[in-house]
Amino acid sequence: MEKNAGTDDALALSEATARDYLVLLKPRVMSLVVFTGLVGLVVAPGHMNPVLAAISILCVAVGAGASGALNMWYDADIDAVMKRTRNRPIPAGIIAPNQVLAFGLTLSAFSVVTLGLMVNWLSAALLAFTIFFYAVVYTMWLKRSTPQNIVIGGAAGAFPPMIGWAAATGEITWDSVVLFMIIFLWTPPHFWALSLFSANDYEAARIPMMPNVKGELSTRRQALFYSIIMAPVGVLPWVLGFAGPVYGAISTLLGLAFVYYAWRMWVAGSQPEMLAAARKLFRFSLLYLSGLFAVLLVEALVMKALIAFGGF
């Protein structure tokens, strides 16, 4: 009987498809990482060989996916408890944990070594540090130990523009640090809004998110605080001259709207009103970051096209 059960388990694990492995890469998170990395690469001064640019973005994507896989390997116990994650490949019994670990480590090594050999070792070092920071510092330490987990751990998601910039220029500049800071400051209000309407899930998994440790009021206050700091930082690319007036105007409007949504969440009276405001802030935060970086990308592409064709 035990032998048959073991055979059934092995059969279930062997039926993992390419789609199941794709889920391990956290494709939705990866898409935002790849996009911000691409923006950093394109906005950086100069022109990069298209093939090397494609290799750089591929390595950022693979590295981001590797981080996601390592996160799912370590967090399998948490994922099994939370409603939104219990159907992931490990808790669902589709892929064995050791296979996920091997998959994540292989992708990590491939992305870092390929980026170093084909592009430059500065960008590879930044990618390696990003993977380490997310998989070890955030996932294995911060996430389960402090309500400031996503404040410090948010650095991992903020590195891709710096990686793209370093791939294109071989340097880390203050301009690339500004792109890092935009995402770094965006992360707390984004995830705290999520944690407010997912508090029960996090509590069941014993993850010390801000609402469960410090309370909803403190979470709302800190989300507003970070939003107020983030809004002017989002305008800095225009102030520093590596973005144009269109970006300056749009980033100002988006920043003011972000602060407004955070303020609405702060002043919400009833529980239903607060939860509705948290969902609106969460959704708008995605629009804010993608919109900001999309305008940066379009402006940079237009400017470089004008220069290339002698129109500027």
Swiss-Prot record:
It is found in: Cell inner membrane. InterPro entries: Protohaem_IX_farnesylTrfase (IPR006369), UbiA_prenyltransferase (IPR000537), UbiA_prenylTrfase_CS (IPR030470), UbiA_sf (IPR044878). The keyword DNA-binding does not apply. GO terms for cellular component: plasma membrane. The keyword Repressor does not apply. It catalyses: heme b + (2E,6E)-farnesyl diphosphate + H2O = Fe(II)-heme o + diphosphate. It is a multi-pass membrane protein. PROSITE patterns: UBIA. Its main location: membrane. Its EC number is 2.5.1.141. One of its GO terms (molecular function) is protoheme IX farnesyltransferase activity. Pathway: Porphyrin-containing compound metabolism; heme O biosynthesis; heme O from protoheme: step 1/1. The chain crosses the membrane at residues 29-49, 50-70, 90-110, 117-137, 150-170, 177-197, 223-243, 248-268, 292-312. GO terms for biological process: heme O biosynthetic process. Keywords: Cell inner membrane, Cell membrane, Heme biosynthesis, Membrane, Transferase, Transmembrane, Transmembrane helix. Belongs to the UbiA prenyltransferase family. Protoheme IX farnesyltransferase subfamily. Carbon 2 of the heme B porphyrin ring is defined according to the Fischer nomenclature. Converts heme B (protoheme IX) to heme O by substitution of the vinyl group on carbon 2 of heme B porphyrin ring with a hydroxyethyl farnesyl side group. This is Protoheme IX farnesyltransferase. It comes from Brucella anthropi (strain ATCC 49188 / DSM 6882 / CCUG 24695 / JCM 21032 / LMG 3331 / NBRC 15819 / NCTC 12168 / Alc 37). The gene is ctaB.
